[in-house]
């Protein structure tokens, strides 16, 4: 069971994060509760999107406005059916997997890759200078 412990989400965009979407039931339950509490937009994010019960439920909830986007990584197979959904965003992790493999092959530390603080500060500096962020 899920118990809501936060403050008001009314009018706010909310991000639901979990390690895995198997059937998706738990995330859908949370999304329904957030919409009941008048969240403006609901985004579902997961590392591994398995969608073991198919996409019908996600299609329905997207069409009814209960979820706005679903984001998962390409660390597991993504069907063409999933990739074609208007609400689905593929988070490409290829670059990071390649960097991890490269660091391991060169006996280098992974801490720089795993700690995002430096990258965040560099992006903020670019933003402050008015540069385009890609």
Language-model features, listed with the residues they occupy:
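PRPP-associated nucleotide enzymes
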Residues: 1-134
